[in-house]
From Swiss-Prot:
The organism's place on the tree of life at top rank: Bacteria
Gene3D superfamilies, per the entry: Mur ligase, C-terminal domain (3.90.190.20), Mur-like, catalytic domain (3.40.1190.10), NAD(P)-binding Rossmann-like Domain (3.40.50.720)
Primary role: Cell wall formation.
Binding site for ATP: G132, A133, H134, G135, K136, T137, T138
EC top class, as a word: ligase
Pathway(s): Cell wall biogenesis; peptidoglycan biosynthesis
GO molecular function: ATP binding; UDP-N-acetylmuramate-L-alanine ligase activity
Cleaved signal peptide residues: none
Name this protein carries in UniProt: UDP-N-acetylmuramate--L-alanine ligase
Keyword terms, alphabetized: ATP-binding, Cell cycle, Cell division, Cell shape, Cell wall biogenesis/degradation, Cytoplasm, Ligase, Nucleotide-binding, Peptidoglycan synthesis
UniProt organism field: Bifidobacterium longum (strain NCC 2705)
Length: 512
């Protein structure tokens, strides 16, 4: 990057070729090293012997972990932090006027996006990427869990933690000694165009991130291109129309090594153009049992032998998790794990953190936290909640994520949230956006959309409450014995759980 040119940060620009290796980076500095995706990559480079340091705005569990590994973390972002670095890594959350970017540019240092580091780590490994609007973290976590249990010791880079036993969490990143790397492929900014995985999993292609892509056609085209870069197999859900459209758009040579999956019997599907098909059959949960039973019909193209009908008993609820399991198990089998061993390991998977994660119970009111932030994810979550808690009142505190997403999907959010009995919508988590750019968008945008629904919202109480603390107290006062309250969203609503549990204790008379 020339020092005489203006600073342009393009996450889609590929900085390395297939021959590059981590040692080529030299001393590497991460801006925002405590971020979920950045901390994992920093740890993996450190394990490869690269000299790594970084900066962040505040201490966190992630920065604490990095420091215990011997990685220096500076708090506050200043020009001097990049003085010793040869390579500076940024994420899409970092702007060109960041003082460390400005200093690195002025000094002529190599500035690369986090996706460049992930692409570099994939070189020389059997890489599995998981892309899609929904299910990335759960599918990549489940696949990593299966491979760990199979003794493969994979590396994995997952945008979150994994649920462990007794309410514990396991780190979402690991630098394994095996030759497999599992990673989420973030489609939000187009940076997944850099990846050339051995296996590309596409969990679904429902429109999202239209602020980047502009329209659904360009969004789907990005997935078609991503599938075309896979050097081995493509695994894609065709339960949603967009996924089927992507499959149909794939060139014949890509279809020939594609494995589609879904809940529709094969004979009821259109011609798949030579793609193999995994049928998810008999998915059900005995009400309140906590076990999702299904059978995966794995074709010879997956097993490299005879077709196999494999029973699976999942501890993660919902049909959406049956789909996630189909993708994870299919990939594991393609990587050499037996169908029986893959299914057994999947049955011990407790879920990714913040995915249907029980945070506590007060006076038999259960609080569950979930990352769902798209209308389809919320609908799947609430369907799973009805299966898991069939006799309970389902209450939701939802924090919308991004003003643009709230604007694009207000009516869809209203329809999905109508599956709950009570809903409070808090202030919107802005992430990379500014309220000033969306002056007419607020929690009331969704509430107003709900008021316009004819039947879907009948019986659902829905209110906007900007302040999360007030929202927690209000919901606690409404709760009764046996209710389940979900905190839902991709922002900082996850920090509300303790406030909510405390509020429930303070208003325990309403819970009895």
């Amino acid at each position: 990057m020339s020092q005489d040119q203006p600073i342009v940060l393009d996450p889609t620009y590929a900085s390395f070729d297939a021959a590059a290796r981590p040692a080529d980076l030299g001393a590497t500095h991460f801006i925002g090293i405590g971020g979920a995706g950045m901390s994992v990559l920093a740890e993996m480079l450190h394990a490869e012997g690269v000299a790594v340091d970084g900066s962040d705005r505040a201490h966190s569990a992630k920065t604490d972990r990095l420091e215990t590994l011997g990685i220096t973390v500076e708090f506050g972002q200043r020009a001097e932090n990049v003085a010793q670095a040869e390579t500076v890594v940024y994420s899409s959350a970092i702007k060109p006027d960041n003082p460390e970017i400005v200093a690195a540019h002025a000094a002529g240092k190599r500035i690369v996006h986090r996706s460049d580091i992930l692409a570099l780590l994939m070189n020389g490994k059997r890489a599995v990427t998981v892309a899609g609007a929904h299910g990335k973290t759960t599918t990549s976590s489940m696949l990593s869990h299966i491979l760990v249990n199979a003794g493969a010791d994979p590396s994995y880079a997952i945008g979150g933690f994994i649920q462990g036993p007794d309410g514990t969490t396991l780190d979402g990143g690991h630098a394994g000694k095996g030759d497999i790397l599992v990673a989420e492929a973030d489609e939000s900014d187009g940076s997944f165009a850099k990846y050339h995985p051995t296996i590309a999993i596409i969990t679904n292609c429902e429109a999202d991130h239209l602020d980047h892509y502009g329209d659904e056609a360009h969004y789907r085209a990005a997935f078609v291109a991503h599938a075309g870069r896979a050097t081995g197999h493509v695994i894609i859900s065709i339960d949603d129309p967009d996924g089927l459209a992507v499959l149909e758009a794939l060139p014949a040579d890509v279809k020939s090594h594609t494995v589609a999956y879904g809940t529709t019997a094969r004979e009821s599907l259109p011609d798949l153009g030579g793609a193999a098909y995994v049928w998810i059959a008999s998915e059900s949960e005995t009400a309140g049992s906590g076990v999702e039973q299904l059978t995966l019909h794995l074709p010879a193209a997956v097993t490299a032998g005879e077709p196999v009908s494999q029973s699976v008993a999942l501890k993660v609820p919902g049909v959406h998790n049956a789909r996630n399991a189909a993708a994870a198990i299919s990939a594991a089998v393609l990587l050499g794990v037996s169908p029986a061993d893959a299914a057994k390991a999947a049955g011990t998977f407790l879920g990714a953190a913040r995915r249907f994660q029980v945070r506590g119970t007060v006076k038999q009111v259960t609080v569950v936290d979930d990352y769902a932030h798209h209308p389809t994810e919320i609908a799947a979550l609430l369907d799973a909640a009805r299966r898991r808690y069939p006799d309970s009142t389902i209450r939701v505190i939802f924090q919308p994520h991004l003003f643009s997403r709230t604007k694009f999907f207000a009516h869809q959010f209203a329809k999905s949230l109508a599956k709950a009995d009570d809903v409070i919508i808090t202030g919107i988590f802005p992430a990379r956006e500014k309220q000033a750019d969306f002056p007419d968008i607020s929690p009331s945008t969704i509430v107003d959309a709900a008021a316009g629904l004819k039947d879907a919202s009948a019986g659902t109480w829905i209110q906007p409450v900007e302040d999360m603390c007030l929202a927690a107290k209000m919901m606690a006062m409404r709760a009764h014995h046996g209710d389940v309250i979900f905190t839902v969203g991709a922002g900082d609503i996850t920090d509300m759980d303790q406030v909510l549990l405390t509020a429930l204790e303070a208003h325990r008379e309403s819970c009895e």
